[in-house]
Every structure is written in structure tokens, then in C-alpha cells.
Amino acid sequence: MILAPLKSRILIALAASALLIPAVASAQSTDVWRKGISTVGELKHPDGFDHFDYVNTKAPKGGTLRLSTSGTFDTLNPLLAKGERATGLSLVYDTLMKSTEEELSASYGLLAEGVSYPDDIEKATFRLRQDAKWADGKPVTPEDVVFSFEKAKDLSPQLATYYTHVTKAEVSGERDITFTFDEKNNRELPQIVGQLLIVPKHWWEGTGPDGKPRDISRGTLEPVMGSGPYKIAAVSPGSSVTYERRDDYWGKDVNVNVGMNNFKTIAYTFFADQDVEFQAFKSGTVDFRQEASSSRWVTGYDFPAVKEGRVKKEELPNIYRSVGIMQAFVPNMRREKFQNPKLRKALNYAFDFEELNRTLAYGQFQRITSFFMGSELASSGLPTGRELEILQELKDQVPPEVFTTEYRNPVAGDPAKQRDNLREAVKLMKEAGYELRGNRMVNAATGQQLDMEFLIDSSGMERTILPYVQNLKKIGINATIRTVDASQYTNRTRSFDFDVTIKLWATSANPGNEQADFWGSAAADRQGSNNLAGIKNPAVDALVRKVIFAPNRDEQVAAARALDRVLLANSYVIPQFYRGEMFIAYWNTLIRPENLPEYGVGFPDAWWSGKAGN
């Protein structure tokens, strides 16, 4: 999957269910072909709907959207896990189904005109639209879909995990592809298969402009071809990518695309320095900015264009409101020094969130208290009902405080409270086998000082980490910060070569297979997985399976809350913070839909240029 073009890109795994809208029956089969998939009640839109409600069907086409992104890139290959992919590649490609920001975990046919599967969901068959075409005019075929699936699993450890229960894809008709699953009744699987990004088999097996065969297992800076609404018009390696809307796009009149893809050109510029990136926005060379810094939002947007109304500022409900999130400092438990849960708990006592929130964030953050923060999946209080029953099944494998103690982070915010917290941290460190000798926290058995290096990819993050580092030093820990470029950071985190890093996990309102990639034992040793903490816990594995195979919503919520409690009780991470709003700023040449969708901002798909047609 290609990540969304907003800066806070995240890979959200949407789940599937049996609550589906039926379409026409196949002439050769009694199976029902469905035009959409949803897990939260019935689909909002009936078969044959015209367009999503939030789009402007009369939005003018044209104009240029200039965007910025952090880091760099060295490949345009959309499936390759190695290297740094360019931002925006999703503009070039289509998926079998298209999700909507109006609904939770709902998708409608894009390349596929329908999907069919039996009641036990042992397989799912997708039927391609007859008029789906690649940019070179050739039809999108079932062979392309099979090729895309196989290469996605081969080339991306993350996608291999995501599709781990999809064992096979095969051509099953002139326009049909059947995916076989290794377990029945996993309601998520048809949905996640529908998210599969489809690439052209014939193009990747063809010859490039240099006369050499293309190789999808390698990086490339040749403009890739897709079936989507845009093509790559210009590339400056590592610096910029420009996409241009295709006038001959086959799917421009498909209902899920009506009112979308309005900009003629979308150009991304890559910045290594966040301050330079912000200056580019201030100068008017970048049109849109999602602001991640609370302090900059409060103090940095007083330039003339804002005062004169030429730059608009908006505070909108956070795009994460449809999901649960965990953002945290992540100790790498593959390293022996972080394997004791009491030591990890001690690290939480050294983090003074309240002081950081007051001095750096102007009080705009909330402390994260759940791995599903902000959603109904978050645990609270003590377990009861079905949640308690699930935990009792694993009573001998989970910390006893799961049943007796509500999870709470330490609270500081003033010197006295922080001193108390640091004393508690020292006590926990002693229980973990460490002791203070002078001003050094050492392993009581070896005498070796505990050291911790925080690995980050942006100097702008140092302001957040420095107060934490200073507190760790107060209790004798040799804490340091190492800032590396985006490429080094990616390579080191993929290979788990770090002490502590920062990670944000985002979970859809209907969690599924991604949970195994986040917390599962199998993912702990697979390079490129999202299990950065290195969690290997049979109880966690069992709870992940209960989440994935929950037969109904009530069971899913209970299982997710039980999972949340066990993850929290093991102190796998040091939770950071969460903001209830997202901050966006944009030049008044951009126009957004009057009514934004419930679970997003519709950017950039449904926005348009005020200069279009001029």
C-alpha cells in the first residue's frame, strides 16, 4: 500500500464484514456480487449511487497544488520495501476497492465492479470492470492482480504480514480473480484484499528506455505507469516529483471518483529541514501545510499573509478520530537491557509529560493512556463482562495487575512531583537489577552503566526528547540522542538497529491483521515489521487472534480492550501524547468542500484550485 499524502501518513488496515449491499447475481453462479463492503452497519450508499456526499460535483478542473514533505526518496517502485519511496505514488495507481472518509471501514468498487464470497469466507472473488485500462490503453487483467499480490508479498515484509492469511490468488474467469484464505470466518480478509494496489504486469516485465529489462525487485527512478488518475510528469531525484492528471483516465466517471482528482498538477518538494519547509510555506511556494508542532501553531503563524487572510488557519477534529492510536518512546526489547518490565516501567516515571505539555505544547496535548487512544476500543477502569472472561482464560499468562489495577501514567508537572517520580524510578530500577553507584545507574551484577540512545530522523524532535534525556541522566542513565537522515533511519528501524525510537501506531475502528504485525511474536524477528518493540508474548498472540476472528462487534471490542490492558500492563512502551485536533493552514488559492467528511478532510482528492479555468 502507498501511504496517504498528508504528512501524518499512516497505514490503516480496514476490516470487512457480512453486512454488505447485494448487487446482481452472476449468470454462471448463484453467488451474490456485492458492490461494496462495510463492517459498521449497512453501507451508507446504495447500489448505483452517483457520488460521495461531501464532494463538489461541479468543482472546476485545473490548477496546480504544491505540497511539501519531509525527507527524501530514491525509488518510484510502489511495492519495494527497500529504499525511500516517493510521496504521492498512490495518485498513479488504482485499487480493487476504494475506501471513503464518510464511513468507518467501508469501501466501494473501483477496478473491481463487484466482489463475491461464501458465508464462511474461505475465499473471495473480485470481478474487474470491463473498461478498466492502464495508461497505455491496455486492459487491466486478472493476471495483473495476481502478479501484484505475489510481488507485494515477496517484496514487502509488512505486506507479507498483512496478507499472511491470504494464501493464493488465481485467475478464475475472464475478468475474475479468486483469493483463497487459510482460515475461515475472518471477516477482514475480503476488505484488505480490496486495498491491494494493482501494478501492470506487462510493463514491469517489459523493457525500459535504457533497453534493459525492468526489475520490480529493484528500485527505479523511471516514471512508473499505472491505471490511476495521474501520471508522473517530472522527477528530480531526491528533491521533487510532479504528477499530472490524465485526461484519458478510464475511471474519471466511476461514482467513487466523481468530484475527485480536480488538480491538473500535484507537485511534491522534499525538505530535509522542517524549518526550511515551513519557510517555503510562508513564502507561498507551498500551498498546504498540516502543522505538527503546537508551539509553531501558536507562535509561528503571525506572518502578514495570515493577518491579511491570504493564508487560512483551521483547527479540525483530528483525522485519527476514526482510529485508535499509540504514539510512544519504544525501547527495543531485542536488546537484553530492555527486557525487564520493571526497568521499562521505571522509564515511564522519568518522563515528565505535564512539564513538556506546558512549556513546549502550550497545553494542547493529552497523555496517551491506551494503545487504542481515542476510540471505543480503549480500555478503562477495571475489566468486566466479556472482557474479563477473555482475560481470565489467560490468567496465568498475564500480569496480575490487569485484574486489580487501572492503568495510569505517572503524573508530574512540578519539581516535587518529579522528584517523587524519579525516586520511584530508582526503586523500580533496583528491582530490575540495577543500582545507583555515585551518579551512575549500573547493572548490579556487572557494574556496567545503563546507556540509552534515542534514534530519530528530525532535529525538530530533539526539543521534545531533551527534557526526558535530562531526567534520565538525573537517575544515572547515560541517555543520548542520535539524529540521522531519513534513509539511515529507515534502514536502522527496519533492521531493529536502535535502543529507543519513537513510533506511532494507528489502528482502524475495526482492527484486524495489522495487529499481528504490530504486536505479534512472528513479526518480532521479521525485518521491516511494525513490531519495533520486539514483543514476544503468547498471551498477546492469543488476544490478537481473538481480535482478528471476532464473530461480531461486541466480541471484537471486548478482545481489543483485553489486548490493550495486557500491552499496557507489560510496559512495552512509554506513552507520549495525543492532540484532539489537527491543524491545517493553506493559501486561499485552495478551496475545500463546504462539508468535510466525518472521518477526514478530503484532501487532496476533493479539494480544488481557485485558479482552475483562469
UniProtKB/Swiss-Prot annotation:
Residues annotated as signal peptide = 1-27
Additional note from the record: YejA is part of the yejABEF operon, but it has been shown that YepA (Atu1774), instead of YejA, is the binding protein involved in peptidoglycan recycling in A.tumefaciens with YejB, YejE and YejF.
Key word Repeat present: no
GO cellular-component term (any)? ATP-binding cassette (ABC) transporter complex
Is Protein transport among the key words of this record?
Answer: yes
A Pfam short name: SBP_bac_5
Q: Which superkingdom is the protein from?
A: Bacteria
Q: What does this protein do?
A: Probably part of the ABC transporter complex YejABEF, which is likely involved in broad-spectrum peptide import.
Q: How does it assemble?
A: The complex is composed of one ATP-binding protein (YejF), two transmembrane proteins (YejB and YejE) and a solute-binding protein (YejA).
What is the deletion mutant like?
A: Deletion of the gene does not affect sensitivity to ampicillin. Mutant does not accumulate peptidoglycans fragments in the extracellular milieu. Deletion of the yejABEF operon leads to the accumulation of anhydromuramyl tri-, tetra- and pentapeptides in large quantities in the extracellular milieu. The yejABEF mutant, but not the single yejA mutant, displays cell swelling and lysis as well as a severe growth defect.
Keywords (alphabetical) are:
Peptide transport, Periplasm, Protein transport, Signal, Transport
Q: Where in the cell is it found?
A: Periplasm
InterPro entries in the cross-refs: Peptide/Ni-bd, SBP_5, SBP_5_dom
Q: Which family does it belong to?
A: Belongs to the bacterial solute-binding protein 5 family.
User: Which SUPFAM superfamilies does the UniProt entry name for this protein?
Assistant: Periplasmic binding protein-like II
A single GO molecular function, which one? Answer: peptide transmembrane transporter activity
Per the UniProt entry, what are the Gene Ontology biological process annotations, in alphabetical order? microcin transport; peptide transport; protein transport
Q: What is this protein called?
A: Probable peptide-binding protein YejA
Main localization category: periplasm
